[in-house]
């Protein structure tokens, strides 16, 4: 189990590659973002995106899964106080392979909850061509292993 002390600035967690499947793009869009470019190949080709494209929210959800698989599920996480920024830099198309990493930007002990550390991270998702498709700046609240901890 990882604790706050395991998150010094500069620590990096790599994401395992994830294939963007057409059926998943369409299913997500049908439920949460029913726009033509997300619902069919023809709708995607007719758009400026050039093909069946994942919703930005779907891209964010895939990023969240990559975060969980790379470190969160093995961390004494107490959730997140929020996302500072979420940028969708390039269309994510059906058939793309996504990977990337997240890096600790800053870590400090909470002033109001001394047993909790606030860890700020930046996640960057890239496609199979190495192009950045999404960037997210966010924070995690992570339990400290010891009182008076330093990351």
Positions of predicted regions on the chain:
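HotDog/MaoC-like acyl-thioester-processing domains
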Residues: 2-9, 88-151
